[in-house]
């Protein structure tokens, strides 16, 4: 699948949870009472789990960047 998210923002929490469940290194962080959150991709080959990419769900272009980083850095869950 080339794109998991459409280019329209924001990413919903339900969408993010579905993707996070399908990848070993995708996380939802900083969940705010207003419903905003950050989608995070970390490099798990590293013992420190270094940050690869992070964006707020409502940021412009977040969907396109997330699709790109999932293709290049996403580790699918087994």
From Swiss-Prot:
Sorted alphabetically, the keyword list is: Plasmid
Q: Which domain of life is it from?
A: Bacteria
Question: Does the record's keyword annotation contain Amino-acid biosynthesis?
Answer: no
Q: What InterPro entries does the entry give?
A: DUF905, YkfF-like_sf
Q: What family is this protein classified in?
A: Belongs to the UPF0401 family.
**Listed name of the protein:** UPF0401 protein YubL
The gene that this protein is the product of is yubL
